[in-house]
Swiss-Prot record:
Death domain location: 850-929
Post-translational modification: Phosphorylated on different cytoplasmic tyrosine residues. Phosphorylation of Tyr-568 leads to an interaction with PTPN11 phosphatase, suggesting that its activity is regulated by phosphorylation/dephosphorylation. Tyrosine phosphorylation is netrin-dependent. Proteolytically cleaved by caspases during apoptosis. The cleavage does not take place when the receptor is associated with netrin ligand. Its cleavage by caspases is required to induce apoptosis.
Impact when changing Y568F: Abolishes interaction with PTPN11, leading to an increased level of phosphorylation
A GO molecular-function annotation: netrin receptor activity
Subcellular location: Cell membrane; Cell surface; Synapse, Synaptosome; Cell projection, Dendrite
Leader sequence segment: 1-40
Main function: Receptor for netrin required for axon guidance. Mediates axon repulsion of neuronal growth cones in the developing nervous system upon ligand binding. NTN1/Netrin-1 binding might cause dissociation of UNC5C from polymerized TUBB3 in microtubules and thereby lead to increased microtubule dynamics and axon repulsion. Axon repulsion in growth cones may also be caused by its association with DCC that may trigger signaling for repulsion. Might also collaborate with DSCAM in NTN1-mediated axon repulsion independently of DCC. Also involved in corticospinal tract axon guidance independently of DCC.
Residues bearing attached sugar chains per UniProt: N236, N361
Gene this protein is translated from: Unc5c
Name under which the protein is recorded: Netrin receptor UNC5C
Classification via PANTHER family: NETRIN RECEPTOR UNC5 (PTHR12582), NETRIN RECEPTOR UNC5C (PTHR12582:SF7)
Residues of the ZU5 domain: 530-673
Tissue expression: Expressed in cortical and cerebellar neurons, including cells of the external and internal granular layer and of the Purkinje cell layer (at protein level). Mainly expressed in regions of differentiating neurons. Highly expressed in brain and lung. Expressed in the cerebellum and the neurons of the hippocampus, with enrichment in neurons of the CA3 hippocampal pyramidal layer. Weakly expressed in testis, ovary, spleen, thymus and bladder. Expressed at very low level in kidney, intestine and salivary gland.
Keyword line: Apoptosis, Cell membrane, Cell projection, Developmental protein, Disulfide bond, Glycoprotein, Immunoglobulin domain, Membrane, Phosphoprotein, Receptor, Repeat, Signal, Synapse, Synaptosome, Transmembrane, Transmembrane helix
Length: 931
């Protein structure tokens, strides 16, 4: 018998151990089942099984071809779990750490023709009752265990849950009435359910597909946003939640898009309705541009306007009385006259009819007429002949003179041509007329150019050049540039630079200024203290301009994978780079460019600027402006008026603003005071000479915007001038009350010093300070010491706004004749790092950041998601901006990184996550040793 089994096993290619397993295991299982049938005994039975048999050939561990998958029980329908493994001598299910009875398994066995290994497939059925009977915090789960001669293998756990969907929505959309082109937000939080319900929106029972109509957007937390409401968007909107159990519809929210009426243009004034005397004229307009729709407001104002008019009445002319008859003349007649002036005709009145003069015979026809004398006839004939001859001579002389003058004119033209050497006038038409310049005066030793002063690196796009090779630039031409104050500044370097440019090069530079002058070469040519640049890839990094309060955060993933950008950020200090200001507007930040412009970004970068606004009041209208390629300043967004279409988001902190943008450009923050209570912060800094060998001593009081870059510029300027800081700078709240800033000096020792100021104080006009467009604004107090032996200066300086706040400086300084080292402690010499790349630029480690994004991006029923994170970090002013991003949590963490750079307050972030119940992330932060 034993030999027969071995022979059969040998013919089938099977080991003896396998045959024993095939025979023994089922028998043992049947005995166990027929015994007690309990799961505990089954468990002991399987523990007593040997792992391998001595006669088994080497065999791999079981490999699962099919693992059990998660299942949901709908109503009372049981679910089946499937499992398939190879090679497997036995395969069983274990549910909730207990073995499933063998009789509950449906087993299918076959031999793989390719490998010759046994493939076993098993399935079990799970009922609703089994799932409901489970008590404990964990859901019902099952796991598949397979045996082979090499050992056992366990599959993954498959959870079985009872599917359901509540009937009541946690938040239903509400109807709204909105104006045309306004943003609409319809909120929806679906009912609780397992599995989590999918959400779709219906517009009049039609499914909304944002891919087809881009005016719709469905956020990650299921809210519907209509970007710009159209008339066609007037409809009934329904939120639909569905899973495998049921489908629920919310109450219908009716959105009505109304149009407020607008007036048409006024018609022309009608003619005066009165033909004579006082009347009126009128003009009309209609409320049809557009006409009010869907309950929109009717136009406010009058549809008819009337003005008084006066039409002058026509006056017909009338004759005056006849004058007296004249005396009787030689011809025996006398006359009389009258005039049409009683009244004269006017305003279209009729003229007088009849004769002005009237004559009649004054002798009743008895006057005698004498015959003409023959001598008189001869005299008359002679006079006529003489006049005729004179006229003929005059005509001949005039003709002669005319012809002579005409020949002289032609001769002049010929001579002029000869002077030109035979060349005909040439009409030069350049490609751009605005690039033609007046040829320089070659006889002059110096050319005088009146206009704005440009820095050396801006010459290529500011100095007009000519394309004509005849007008080559003069070598060593001295150009004197007159600025607005009338001072003359030699610009030898400017002339030398322009003389080295060929006309072709100049034209090429001008044609490509929009692309080339904004890139990395511009950043490298500017003042190094105002610029930071570096090379970045998809890992991101940080650009910092030291001591300026200006930085650019490039988050990881902002630059597309595989691309490398050379990026820069620079502060513009020239006044012509600043945006124009209206009366009530003021510049709150420095003008900053970041680039390269036009670079493709996949997520927002964060530009951080220091501002000087006092955000504690609500009397500001703060807006972000950017400069287009053509140099025009455009409005980007008004803080507090963001909508779905605004390209940027601004986080305004107490002293800094953070601009989230995907468009690298030139930006500035502009404030407009809505009331006189609006205030901006000024920084008052007092400087004096480092050494003074004369009797005069000058004190300079600077009134600057309270930004780091403004103070840095003055510190650098004073360092070049040999100045020193006499007192710690102080802040002053300057209100938009139109009152000037008054500066005065007090408590001078008159026995040692005297002030050369004639008045009691100096004033800086309000608008010079408020506009923020004037750099390095200051006043100078000149004191004269009575003796060179006087080396101590003690006085007080008072700076205050009329009817406003003020500051007092107590000066106590030593006047030295010997120069000493310049000490400007406000410039941190250690702040020399301008570029940080890769993970070292960020406080949050990348794995923890990814874990946070994956767990907080998905909306949670209790709200413990990215919205709560934004609320806890005080970044929830406009959540819709984050909702439109693929990872709202990632953008919020980027903004947190920019706010807390460079220290990174991870302890505060950990406390926030602890409050949100994210204990695992806090543990990870602690494990990384980050706080």
């Amino acid at each position: 018998m034993r030999k027969g089994l071995r022979a059969t096993a040998a013919r089938c290619g099977l080991g003896l151990g396998y045959l024993l397993q095939m025979l023994v295991l089922p028998a043992l299982a049947l005995l166990s089942a027929s015994g007690t049938g309990s799961a505990a005994q089954d468990d002991e039975f399987f523990h007593e099984l040997p792992e391998t048999f001595p006669s088994d050939p080497p065999e791999p561990l079981p490999h699962f071809l099919i693992e059990p998958e998660e299942a949901y029980i709908v109503k009372n329908k049981p679910v089946n779990l499937y499992c398939k493994a190879s090679p497997a001598t036995q395969i069983y299910f274990k549910c909730n750490s207990e073995w499933v009875h063998q009789k509950d398994h449906v087993v299918d066995e076959r031999v793989d023709e390719t490998s010759g290994l046994i493939v076993r497939e098993v399935s079990i059925e799970i009922s609703r009752q089994q799932v409901e009977e489970l008590f404990g915090p964990e859901d019902y789960w099952c796991q598949c265990v397979a045996w082979s001669s090499a050992g056992t293998t366990k599959s993954r756990k498959a959870y079985v849950r009872i599917a359901y969907l509540r009937k009541t929505f946690e938040q239903e959309p509400l109807g709204k009435e909105v104006s045309l082109e306004q943003e609409v937000l319809l909120q929806c939080r679906p009912p609780e359910g397992i599995p989590v319900a999918e959400v779709e929106w219906l517009k009049n029972e039609d499914i909304i597909d944002p891919a087809e109509d881009r005016n719709f957007y469905i956020t990650i937390d299921h809210n519907l946003i209509i970007k710009q409401a159209r008339l066609s968007d007037t409809a009934n909107y329904t939120c639909v939640a569905k899973n495998i159990v049921a489908k629920r519809k919310s109450t219908t929210a009716t959105v009505i898009v109304y149009v407020n009426g607008g007036w048409s243009t006024w018609t022309e004034w009608s003619v005066c309705n009165s033909r004579c005397g006082r009347g009126y004229q009128k003009r009309t307009r209609t409320c049809t541009n557009p006409a009010p729709l869907n309950g929109g407001a009717f136009c406010e104002g009058q549809s008819v306007q009337k003005i008084a008019c006066t039409t002058l009445c026509p006056v017909d002319g009338r004759w005056t009385s006849w004058s007296k008859w004249s005396t009787c003349g030689t011809e025996c007649t006398h006359w009389r006259r009258r005039e049409c002036t009683a009244p004269a005709p006017k305003n279209g009145g009729k003229d007088c009819d009849g004769l002005v003069l009237q004559s009649k015979n004054c002798t009743d026809g008895l006057c005698m007429q004498a015959a003409p004398d023959s001598d008189d006839v001869a005299l008359y004939v002679g006079i006529v002949i003489a006049v005729t001859v004179c006229l003929a001579i005059t005509v001949v002389v005039a003709l002669f003179v005319y012809r002579k003058n005409h020949r002289d004119f032609e001769s002049d033209i010929i001579d002029s041509s000869a002077l030109n050497g035979g060349f005909q006038p040439v009409n030069i038409k350049a490609a751009r007329q605005d690039l033609l310049a007046v040829p320089p005066d070659l006889t002059s030793a110096a050319a005088m150019y009146r206009g704005p002063v440009y820095a050396l690196h801006d010459v290529s796009d500011k100095i007009p050049m000519t394309n004509s090779p005849i007008l080559d630039p003069l070598p060593n031409l001295k150009i004197k540039v007159y600025n607005s104050s009338g001072a003359v500044t030699p610009q030898d370097d400017l002339a030398e630079f322009s003389s080295k440019l060929s006309p072709q090069m100049t034209q090429s530079l001008l044609e490509n200024e929009a692309l080339n002058l904004k890139n990395q070469s511009l950043a490298r040519q500017t003042d190094p203290s105002c610029t930071a640049f570096g090379t970045f890839n998809s890992l991101g990094g940080h650009l910092i301009i030291p001591n300026s309060g200006v930085s650019l955060l490039i988050p990881a993933g902002a630059i597309p994978q595989g691309r490398v950008y050379e990026m820069y950020v620079t502060v513009h200090r020239k006044e012509n780079m600043r945006p124009p200001m209206e009366d009530s507007q003021t510049l709150l930040t420095p003008v900053v460019s970041c680039g390269p412009p036009g670079a493709l970004l996949t997520r927002p970068v964060i530009l951080t600027l220091h501002h000087c606004a006092d955000p504690s009041t609500e009397d500001w209208k703060i807006q972000l402006k950017n400069q287009a390629v053509q140099g025009q300043w455009e409005d980007v967004v008004v803080v507090g008026e963001e909508n779905f279409t605004t390209p940027c988001y601004i986080q305004l902190d107490a002293e800094a603003c953070h601009i989230l943008t995907e468009n690298l450009s030139t930006y500035a923050l502009v404030g407009q005071s809505t009331t006189k209570a609006a205030a901006k912060r000024l920084k008052l800094a007092i400087f004096g000479p480092l050494c003074c060998s004369s009797l005069e001593y000058s004190i300079r009081v600077y009134c600057l915007d309270d930004t780091q870059d403004a103070l840095k510029e003055v510190l650098q300027l004073e360092r070049q001038m040999g100045g020193q800081l006499l007192e710690e700078p102080k802040a002053l709240h300057f209100k938009g009350s139109i009152h000037n800033l008054r500066l005065s000096i007090h408590d001078i020792a008159h026995s040692l010093w005297k002030s050369k100021l004639l008045a009691k104080y100096q004033e800086i006009p309000f608008y010079h300070i408020w506009s923020g467009s004037q750099r390095n604004l200051h006043c100078t107090f000149t004191l004269e010491r009575l003796s060179l032996n006087t080396v101590e200066l003690v006085c007080k300086l008072c700076v205050r706004q009329v009817e406003g706040e003020g500051q007092i400086f107590q000066l106590n300084c030593t006047v030295s004749e010997e120069p000493t080292g310049i000490d400007l402690p406000l410039l941190d010499p250690a702040s020399t790092i301008t570029t940080v790349t890769g993970p070292s630029a960020f406080s949050i480690p990348l794995p923890i950041r990814q874990k946070l994004c994956s767990s907080l991006d998905a909306p949670q029923t209790r709200g413990h998601d990215w919205r709560m994170l934004a609320h806890k970090l005080n970044l929830d002013r406009y959540l819709n901006y984050f909702a439109t991003k693929s990872s709202p949590t990632g953008v919020i963490l980027d903004l947190w990184e920019a706010q807390n750079f460079p220290d990174g307050n991870l302890s505060m972030l950990a406390a926030v996550l602890e409050e949100m119940g994210r204990h695992e992330t806090v543990v990870s932060l602690a494990a990384e040793g980050q706080y």
